A protein has these predicted regions:
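C-terminal polymerase-core module
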Residues: 113-151
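Residue-level detector of intrinsically disordered, flexible termini
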Residues: 51-53, 118, 161
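Long, charge-rich alpha-helical interaction segments
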Residues: 149-188
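Signature for HUH/AEP ssDNA processing cores
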Residues: 1-114, 127, 133, 178-188
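General "foldedness" signal
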Residues: 96, 141-143, 170
Length: 188
């Protein structure tokens, strides 16, 4: 199942995070780190939200070009979907909000990896719903929180009376996003 959205669709702010690792150990080590860094940043931007988090981690193949020769690389994906409940906007307004506030340039600490996938903010696109799969992909999207049947509407992107209680406007001003600070390393 998918949700179809256009630039004019009323939605809750949503963010897609996709990180690829060639090593399963690196992927497993970073799942909670990536989830926590992303959630902490989004909570600063949307202070009055509850955040519905879903994931679809697992084995993934990625195309890589070297000297114009495409090869497929086996790796492991970390994939999260964050939905800001109790806020409402349109896909087009959210795309502009994210651009104006530099959210597409935020990187995970100690990495060169960008936090947010901006390709999901398009005029006409399918967003996968819970318990669904992308075509030709074995990774199922499952809720990390709000798993009870009466809470699953928190994961729905489209905003309506049935899916979104307060429907607050996007914040007027946002502090410039920063990569979360690095904790000092203990001295030997």
């Amino acid at each position: 199942y998918f949700e179809w959205t256009t630039y004019k669709s009323k939605v809750k702010p949503f963010y897609d995070v996709d990180v690829f690792y060639e090593s399963k150990e690196e992927q497993e080590k970073n799942i909670e780190i990536i989830k926590n860094e992303t959630r902490d940043l989004l909570k600063q931007i949307y202070p009055e939200t509850t955040i519905a988090i879903a994931s679809s981690h697992g084995e993934k193949y990625k195309n890589k070009s070297v000297n114009k020769v495409k090869t497929q690389i086996k790796g492991y994906a970390i994939s999260f979907h964050f939905v800001m409940c109790d806020y409402e906007t349109t896909v087009g307004e959210l795309k502009v909000f994210n651009e104006l506030n530099g959210l597409y340039d935020v990187k995970f600490k100690d990495t060169n990896l960008k936090m947010f996938d901006k390709a999901v903010y398009r005029d006409g696109g399918n967003m996968r719903f819970l318990y669904s799969y992308k075509p030709n992909d074995d990774r199922q999207k499952v809720p990390d929180n709000y798993k009870d049947s009466y809470c699953l509407t928190k994961h729905v992107i489209q905003s309506s009376n049935a899916t979104n209680h307060f429907r607050r406007a996007l914040p007027d001003t946002v502090s410039p996003p920063t990569t979360p600070p690095v904790s000092p390393k203990p001295k030997d």
